[in-house]
Swiss-Prot record:
Pfam families: Serpin (PF00079). The keyword Glycoprotein applies. Keywords: Glycoprotein, Protease inhibitor, Serine protease inhibitor. Gene3D superfamilies: Alpha-1-antitrypsin, domain 1 (2.30.39.10), Antithrombin, subunit I, domain 2 (3.30.497.10). This is Serine protease inhibitor A3F. It comes from Mus musculus (Mouse). The gene is Serpina3f. It comes from the Eukaryota. The reactive center loop (RCL) extends out from the body of the protein and directs binding to the target protease. The protease cleaves the serpin at the reactive site within the RCL, establishing a covalent linkage between the serpin reactive site and the protease. The resulting inactive serpin-protease complex is highly stable. Variability within the reactive center loop (RCL) sequences of Serpina3 paralogs may determine target protease specificity.
Length: 445
């Protein structure tokens, strides 16, 4: 933290007018309610997922769509003209139906809801701006970032990259309970601003697995390959269940003790690509509407830890967000001039699933699940082949995390239960990558 001091809208000012603002949003959210934002969030999540899978079809995937959306929406406060339009439409908002101010008000409402203390489920999310000490930021941009996204602001000396890197990494580590310790490995001296968004999730299964029942078992990577992994087991579990015959997959929902749940999608052998191609907001709604409590005689789920790193500046253009990374970028609402562009967006996620619960940092994760199927004959569900996972907040219907488990053995650590996905934006001539959710970096053009 040495060499850095809080800026105008640092943490102590975050609550200024916040309660009144939240009440106003709660009373006036008509164009953008939680369901509208949830639908856009899900649409973006599935679109990004398909791009990630397209590049690495047989690898694990873990990311926090909500964290990435929040970071980009916050950055859009500083964008104008086509740059602004591309960001918001890339996040799957219909600007004809949903005006830009309503989008930001909706995020403010959701961020406040998620920050409320819950019953045994801890969700912590926040944003921070690290600004080059000589860079003049418009007061309007800083105030909107504080009021709408609860963003803290700090000055940093990017001419001393080691000190600036330590400042940012310490901030992220402190706010993700140490789950993400090195978001950034180095910083370019041309960096002018780094935007960080983090999300930390920790929950306990309503029906935890018994560690004594966990044993090594086969996980089939494909028709010809398998690995031995720790397999958790729970018997006689009643939980929401749906068999989707059209898409050839089984859907099970495992609930946490608070306002969160994990949905597991198990495609039939050889049907993963069919399910992935069908991922749409309507698909998720159909699954949720079709889930019914069923008795599952035996449910087996791998105990695992997986992690991923993504440079999103190479992927977001496929979703229509292009100008942000070019010399045509208009981020003049940040400084008053068109002298900034985004050089890099990095997303890092860690997901651990174990018997008792889930812990995540700026990302997604969940543990201990249970499910059931109401049928006359014995029902057994084995997650012994690649499957999908979606962790959602049940109050807002927001998809906090999404994952594809292709190989539970890809990481060595199977013991802890945690998820980490911070998001950072760095503003500089070339986008700088960071470890955790999403990191946009801004540099001078």
């Amino acid at each position: 933290m040495a060499g850095v001091s809080p800026a105008v809208f640092g943490c102590p000012d975050v609550t200024l007018g916040r309660n009144t603002a939240v009440r106003e949003v709660q009373e006036n959210i008509t164009s953008v309610d939680s369901l509208t934002l949830a639908s856009s969030n899900t649409d973006f999540a599935f679109s990004l997922y398909k791009e990630l899978v397209l590049k690495n079809p047989d690898e694990n995937v873990v990311f926090s769509p909500f964290s990435i959306c929040t970071a980009l929406a916050l950055l859009s406060l500083g964008a104008k003209s086509n740059t602004l339009k591309e960001i918001l439409e890339g996040l799957k908002f219909n600007l004809t139906e949903t005006p830009e101010p309503d989008i930001h008000q909706g995020f403010r409402y959701l961020l406040d809801l998620l920050s409320q203390p819950g019953n045994q489920v801890q969700i912590s999310t926040g944003s921070a701006l690290f600004i080059e000490k000589h860079l003049q930021i418009l007061a309007e941009f800083k105030e909107k970032a504080r009021a709408l996204y609860q963003a803290e602001a700090f000055t940093a000396d990017f001419q001393q990259p080691l000190e600036a890197t330590k400042l940012i990494n310490d901030y992220v580590s402190n706010h993700t309970q140490g789950k993400i310790k090195e978001l950034i490995s180095d910083l370019d001296k041309r960096t002018l601003m780094v935007l960080v968004n983090y999300i930390y999730f920790k929950g306990k299964w309503e029906m935890p697995f018994d560690p004594d029942d966990t044993c090594k078992s086969e996980f089939y990577l494909d028709e010809n390959r398998s690995v031995k992994v720790p397999m958790m087991k729970i018997n006689n579990l009643t939980t929401p269940y749906f068999r989707d015959e059209e898409l050839s997959c089984t859907v099970v929902e495992l609930k946490y003790t608070g306002n969160a749940s994990a949905m597991f999608i198990l495609p039939d052998q050889g049907k993963m690509q069919q399910v992935e191609a069908s991922l749409q907001p309507e698909t998720l709604r159909n699954w949720k509407d079709s889930l019914k409590p069923r008795l599952i005689n035996e449910l087996c789920l791998p105990k695992f830890s997986i992690s991923t790193d993504y440079s999103l500046e190479h992927i977001l253009p496929e979703l229509g967000i292009r100008e942000l990374f070019s010399t045509q970028a208009d981020l003049s609402a940040i400084t008053g001039t068109k002298d900034l562009r985004t050089s890099q967006v990095v997303h890092k996620a860690v997901l651990d699933v174990a018997e008792t619960g889930t812990e995540a940092a700026a990302g997604t994760g969940y543990q201990n699940l249970q499910c059931c199927q109401g049928v006359i004959y014995s029902m057994k569900i084995y997650f012994d082949r690649p499957f999908l996972m979606i962790i959602s907040d049940t109050n807002t219907h927001i998809a906090l995390f999404m994952a594809k488990v292709s190989n539970p053995e890809s990481d060595e650590n199977f013991l802890n239960v945690e998820y980490a996905f911070p998001q950072v934006l760095e503003i500089m001539p070339e986008y700088r990558s960071v470890c955790t959710c999403c990191l946009p970096c801004l540099t001078r053009q």
